[in-house]
Amino acid sequence: MSQEYLDFELPIAELEAKIESLRAVSGDDNEINLDDEIKRLQKKSEELTKKTFANLDAWQISRMARHPNRPYTLDYIQHIFTEFEELAGDRAFADDKAIVGGLARLDGRPVMVIGHQKGRTTKEKVLRNFGMPAPEGYRKALRLMEMAERFKLPIITFIDTPGAYPGVGAEERGQAEAIARNLREMSTLSVPVICTVIGEGGSGGALAIGVGDKVNMLQYSTYSVISPEGCASILWKSAEKASTAAEVMGLTAERLKELDLIDNIVTEPLGGAHRNYAETAQNLKARLLTDLEDLDVLDKDDLLDRRYQRLMSYGYC
C-alpha cells in the first residue's frame, strides 16, 4: 500500500521522497555509497515527524482519524485475533457489509468481535457503504452480542464510522429503532463489553456498538455527535469553519479522557496507526487483555451495576 500524506505532513513527505530517491540511486550503482546521507535525512525526518505530531490540533486529528491508509476492523482482527470465523446476516432482512463480526480467539480465549468496516478501493467503499451501517447491520451486531451472552463470551467492538446510514430505505426499515434497541440491550448484557474507537466515532452510528464496561480510543481517533463539517454548516452556515468547529467540539481522545467519557487512550506509532499496523495492533491487544483481566473478577451483578453507574455519570448536573 502506497503511503499517503495529509497537507500538514507535506514537509515530511518531501524528506521521505528524497530518502527513497537516494536509496534508488545507491541501489542502482554499487560504487556510490549514500548511507550517511540517507541516515542524516532519516534522522531529520523522524525529528520533523515528532515535532509535527506533538502539536496536532483537533481538526488535524479529525483528518488523521479518516486517513485512507488507517487500519480498519478487519486489519485489527487479522493482527490481534486467531481463528476468526465471520458470522453474517441479521436473520430478518440482509447482511450489511458495513458491520463485520464473528467468533475469534484473543490469546487463546474465545471472544465475540464486532466492528464497523470501511473500504479502500472504490468497489470496497461501495460494498461497505463507506462504513455507514443500515438497520440490518446493527441488528446483525445485536444478534452476535446476544449469541455471545448465551455462550458467556466477552464482546469486543471496534468503532469506525462517520455515522449510521441516513438513506430513505434505512429510515423505512427502522434505523432509529435499531440503534435505540442496541443501546438498551448493550446496557444489560451479562458479559464483559469492551469498546474501542479506532477511527471516526460518529454520532448514534458509533454509540450503537459503543455501550460497554470499558471504552477506549486510539490516540488519533475522534468521537462526537456530528462531524466538524456538519457542525460548522449548522452553526456558521459554512463547512469552511470545520477547523473552528473541531476545536470547540472536544472530539479528541485527550479531551474526552479529561471529561471521563472514555477510560484509556491507546498510543499510536509515530506518524499514526497507518505507519505501522503491527505496532498499533500490539498496543491495542495489550489494552484489551488488561481490560479483560480487570473485568473478569466481577460477577454479573457487579458488572451490570458498574456499567449502570458509568452511564449515569455522563453529562453535567
From Swiss-Prot:
The keyword Signal does not apply. It is found in: Cytoplasm. InterPro entries: Acetyl_CoA_COase_a_su, ClpP/crotonase-like_dom_sf, COA_CT_C. Pathway: Lipid metabolism; malonyl-CoA biosynthesis; malonyl-CoA from acetyl-CoA: step 1/1. GO terms for biological process: fatty acid biosynthetic process; malonyl-CoA biosynthetic process. It catalyses: N(6)-carboxybiotinyl-L-lysyl-[protein] + acetyl-CoA = N(6)-biotinyl-L-lysyl-[protein] + malonyl-CoA. PROSITE patterns: COA_CT_CTER. Keywords: ATP-binding, Cytoplasm, Fatty acid biosynthesis, Fatty acid metabolism, Lipid biosynthesis, Lipid metabolism, Nucleotide-binding, Transferase. The keyword Lipid metabolism applies. Its EC number is 2.1.3.15. GO terms for cellular component: acetyl-CoA carboxylase complex. Residues 40-294 form the CoA carboxyltransferase C-terminal domain. Its main location: cytoplasm. Belongs to the AccA family. Acetyl-CoA carboxylase is a heterohexamer composed of biotin carboxyl carrier protein (AccB), biotin carboxylase (AccC) and two subunits each of ACCase subunit alpha (AccA) and ACCase subunit beta (AccD). This is Acetyl-coenzyme A carboxylase carboxyl transferase subunit alpha.
